[in-house]
Amino acid sequence: MSETINTAAQFPSFEKPTVQFNEKGWGPCELPDTFKDVPYQPFSKNDRLGKICDWTNTSNNDKKYQNKYASSFGTGIQYSYYHEEDETTFHLVDTARVQKPPHQRGRFRNMRNSRSGRGRNARGGLNTHGMTTLSGKNVKARDPRHGRGMGKKFGHRGPPPKMRESSVAVRADWASIEEMDFPRLIKLSLPNIKEGVDIVTCGTLEYYDKTYDRINVKNEKPLQKIDRIVHTVTTTDDPVIRRLSKTVGNVFATDAILATIMCSTRSNYSWDIVIEKVGDKVFMDKRDHTEFDLLTVNESSVEPPTDDDSSCNSPRNLAIEATFINHNFSQQVLKTGDQEPKYKFEESNPFISEDEDIQVASVGYRYKKWELGSDIVLVARCEHDGVLQTPSGEPQFMTIKALNEWDSKLANGVEWRQKLDTQRGAVLANELRNNACKLAKWTVQAVLAGSDQLKLGYVSRINPRDHSRHVILGTQQFKPHEFATQINLSMDNAWGILRCIIDLVMKQKDGKYLIMKDPNKPIIRLYDIPDNTFDSDDSDDGEGDDEGFQQVYNYAHNKI
């Protein structure tokens, strides 16, 4: 009997394996199923272990980077774990922090740990860790987790930026009527407004002392404290405007109020103006006992003063100091004394009575009217600070103001004592950047008053830390209209903004309204407020209507 033998069961079979051939490179062409979807982080055995892997890095398929296949070992070191105390739940606030000088700012600007494949430490970028060995302290400073360096710059840690406070708290019973943003206001224009016509002139002016034109840094002069009363009277408390409102005009204001509205697009801080509409007449007022009359300092600066009331360099304390300097400077540069000649207007100062024996600041008031079209006649009180005697004998009226230097290092400015005599243009350009709104207001007030000259004084602290003693370092004068062109101030646009607000109020019913600049946005809002708003503040003072215009300030005895 024959027997069949199965050789296949006795001997192992040989199957030909499939060999992958990569024609375009080296290595396998396909990824085995075992290793699919497994994240991979490039690494080196010399790297310290920080985390398992990082798959958040986006792939870069752009072929224009020649070094995209460069080694990216060490890219995960920025995510390494450092055993330290947890500081994520709190932050320290140093009120006495000294700001870095300008040359130290932005020193880590080009050392960002970008994940886009283009920055340092990223794939295709410059690998700084492969080139430089950093100490633990330096690595910590560049680590975004620690709230210093880049982390603080990009806002990952630290307190949020402080929001500015509104000049007045908006109440629940106020109705918002209109919002006007700055881009729309900048486009307004009201051309061909003629010069104002004088209606009434009041007050007495003293003549300017030309010796102050020879002051320079090497021949500085101390700023004196002048014991004189300065009246800051609002529109409805002005007895002359009350008298004129019965026969002339239908819109009434002061030059300070008009300048605030006309230069509103340059303002950053919040302000408010109360408007009353009675029939076809509109009265623009400032609220009593507010900071409306204080001069801002570095309002338009890239780095405004820090909001710390305990510091002499806080915005409010600097405003008080600037107002103190401005009023004392405007009186010191005049020829004072009983024997010195004075320029007297037709009427006496309307804010003092004949029986009062007080020293009043040199000021001349012009009550002028302007035709704004559409039967709108504006009547406003404007001011001169001094008068200059020309060789021909004709008087030239002056608006005298003062710029003040408080701390050039903190203000990111230029040293006046080094640049004022040789590069006065650079000093003025820096002031135009930091105080654009204040200088524009002064220019508008000089134009409205019809001043022939705008005199600017440069006043600085004797010591940057002492805000009570100052010196005059120099003076400079301009023609108001030429200076307006120099600072890019368009009077057509200023009149257009004013006319826009007047038209909005004229369309409303009789009552009380308030326009306010938003403290944090470039917006002006118009509110309809109850008629008794702010009346409670006036009644507490116990002053009658006849004494309302006697609001005065004595800047010689102010404690700053």
From Swiss-Prot:
Keywords: Cytoplasm, Initiation factor, Phosphoprotein, Protein biosynthesis, RNA-binding. It comes from the Eukaryota. The modification Phosphothreonine is found at T128. Pfam families: eIF-3_zeta (PF05091). GO terms for molecular function: mRNA cap binding; translation initiation factor activity. Residues 98-166 are annotated as: Disordered. Component of the eukaryotic translation initiation factor 3 (eIF-3) complex. The eIF-3 complex interacts with pix. This is Eukaryotic translation initiation factor 3 subunit D-1. It comes from Drosophila melanogaster.
